[in-house]
């Protein structure tokens, strides 16, 4: 696996989180498997490669890849506007987080507690989701830049959905951090679109 593929997997994780946030906001539903994959990505330590962060299978990121392709192709018929907005916001928030060592320490200290809960209850248990959402609320949601989630108020006002959305945003920002650590830059999305798309098309063939 080359470095660009590693970057695209991490970026696919950002977009996967964005797609799931949009899905919950609009319909109140997202599969437990998809949510579990993203929550699990918060807890992976010392992965052998980037794909292992997301369960070791490209299929787990299929929806994220599709949204990323739609953004890079700039085709109005395939562009998922809200997921793109959420993804770009997560990339921006990660840059702010990187300047906040105190906030990184809080996140680093509380993730082992969430790991213990996940070991006891399972990844998608309401306690694990609530703790992950609370960690986002106590840290990233206090930054100047905020992510405004749009959708159906019937679903957004449900506490369980709000926790899922916050937990997914935390996971997406973790993926954004990984992307940047692998050498990813926002200008690539503008100036290296063709190169990224060529690599993505090949990666997506294994998920269809």
UniProtKB/Swiss-Prot annotation:
It is a peripheral membrane protein. Keywords: Cell inner membrane, Cell membrane, Cytoplasm, Membrane. One of its GO terms (cellular component) is plasma membrane. Its main location: cytoplasm. The keyword Membrane applies. It is found in: Cytoplasm; Cell inner membrane. Belongs to the HflD family. NCBIfam families: PRK00218.1-2 (NF001246), PRK00218.1-3 (NF001247). This is High frequency lysogenization protein HflD homolog. It comes from Pseudomonas entomophila (strain L48). The gene is hflD.
